[in-house]
Curated annotation (Swiss-Prot):
It comes from the Eukaryota. InterPro entries: APOC4. This is Apolipoprotein C-IV. GO terms for cellular component: high-density lipoprotein particle; very-low-density lipoprotein particle.
Length: 127
C-alpha cells in the first residue's frame, strides 16, 4: 500500500534530479578550471543552453529506445508471443471453452466487418 505523500515526494525527487542535471550541464559548458573572464550576459549564459541540451539528450534517448525495441513490434515477434501464450494458457482448455472462444472471435470479426466501409473491406479481404 502506498502512503498518501509518496506521489508528491516522487515528483519532488524527479524535479530535484532535473535541476541537478541542468546544473551539471551548465558547469560542463564552462569548462575545467573555472573561467577568468567576466560572466556573460543572461541571454547568452550557459543556462540558455540547457533546453537545447535536454532536447538533444531526450531525442537521442527516444531514438535509441525505439531502435532497440523495434524487433518487438515486428509481426514475427508478436506472432511468436501470441503462439507461446496460446500454448501456455489456452492449449489445454476444454472443447466447450474453445468453442466459446471461436464464436467470440467470429462475432468480433463480424462486428468489425460491419463497421468497415465496403470500399476498404472487400469480401476477399476477410476470407
Amino acid at each position: 500500500m502506498l502512503f498518501p505523500g509518496c506521489r508528491s515526494r516522487a515528483l519532488s525527487s524527479l524535479c530535484f534530479c532535473v535541476l541537478v542535471l541542468a546544473c551539471v550541464v551548465a558547469c560542463q559548458q564552462e569548462g575545467p578550471g573555472g573561467n577568468s573572464s567576466p560572466p556573460p550576459e543572461p541571454a547568452s549564459s550557459s543556462w540558455s543552453l540547457v533546453p537545447g541540451k535536454m532536447k538533444e539528450w531526450m531525442e537521442s534517448l527516444v531514438t535509441r529506445t525505439r531502435e532497440s525495441w523495434q524487433w518487438f513490434w515486428g509481426p514475427r515477434a508478436f506472432q511468436g508471443f501470441v503462439q507461446t501464450f496460446y500454448d501456455d494458457h489456452l492449449g489445454d482448455l476444454g472443447s466447450h471453452t474453445q468453442a466459446w472462444l471461436h464464436s467470440s472471435k467470429d462475432s468480433l470479426l463480424n462486428k468489425a466487418y460491419n463497421l468497415c466501409p465496403q470500399l476498404l473491406c472487400r469480401d476477399s479481404y476477410w476470407d
